[in-house]
Amino acid sequence: MTIYFVAGEVSADNHGAALMRSLRRLDPELKFIGRGGPQMQQIAGAQFKNWIGDAAVLGLWEVLRKYGYFREQFRQTLSEIQESKPDAVVLIDYPGFNLRLARALRRQSQIQKTIYYISPQVWAWNRGRIKKMARFIDLVLCIFPFETDLYAASGLHAVFVGHPMIERLETQKIETYRDQNLIGLFPGSRSREVRKIFPVMIEAARRLLQLNPTLRFQVAAASEQLADQMRKMVAPHLDPLPSGRGEAKVETEPNESLDQRSASSKGKVKMQVAPNESSHQAPLPLSRGEERVRGPKGPLPHPIEIAVGQTAAMMQHAFVGIVASGTAALEAAYFGMPFVLIYKVAWPTYVAARLVVNVDFLGMPNLLAAKEVAPEFIQHEAKPDAIAKAVRLLMEDSLARHRMISDFDAIISKLGGTGASERSAQAILEELKEGRSPGRPGGVETAAPWSTR
């Protein structure tokens, strides 16, 4: 049997690769084709297209700017599926592209099955689309327990499989400690997202350093390319040494208030580059080009360090995090790292979203808890002073920290534990054997008796 996959984002590439491995364990003869990211391509082979770098965009405005590209990719994808005639198409998240593709495929009746893995969040912006989805999707694999209830009356076959993130993060647990001077910055996995959010994080870090020069900041980069982009964004905030030597400092006045410093220095904390110093205080391996500074109390890591591929380790070591809205928020909750959440996109995208989104919170931990567990700073509210104030509270108020961590534990317990990819693979193969078609009486299922529903 042949399965055609479509994944358009880094997180979908992670989940798609895990699903492919589980499918291969159940049926080694399966052939995988389609488009996704490097992890999926490594499993499927050279015929699988890696398009993540161009396909991963954030928001309506960004999509409109690349409309010609996406129109051509849509045409190519449809043509590839028509020519290869796979037994099933598995669409992973990426609803703007994948829902249109599913509808187009059903019109042409070119494939046996259309399966949607990681349900599109239509419950947030257009619940009326659920009934329409039932006309062209055979099976939806849901990662949140409340989603299956929304599909129950629609005729759309839905299975709660649990969140695939859990099995990946379970393997990334390490023995470490919470460094009370370390703050993690998680600006997202897309270039445009980083350009919008990382400057706000840098400014929040500046405010926090003004209050406590011993603080350290580590930034999670999804790739070396993003790390280079972040280094260039940090560079203007650094004061190069006149001598070009590898010694530097953070300059502050010990008895000066934040407001006084802001007035006298226009909000700037002077940071100078020291490329080659070492410190026993930095347990995480950092990316190439790591820089360090010398603070007033001796050697300290550079206030803003950039680490590639160290997100999980950083979330287990940082005392507090500043996190871009998205998958990283749930990851932070899983690892029990108190955090504040930032959402910032182009204004046309934000205005359009306000017109259609119908949820009380943007962060998934808050949605699952039905309350604001982690503070959210959205668009114009994402101001450095407000973010720094919220971070300080989580660093200094042990009760607030413990309450947040306890809420995180309750949230993660709803996600089904490990094995989501295996359960998803089983559900896909069962669907292929049973020969259902869209429009049949649907319902809610769970893939295993462990379900918390």
Predicted features by range, described:
Residues M1-R453:
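Nucleotide-activated sugar donor-binding and catalytic core shared by glycosyltransferases
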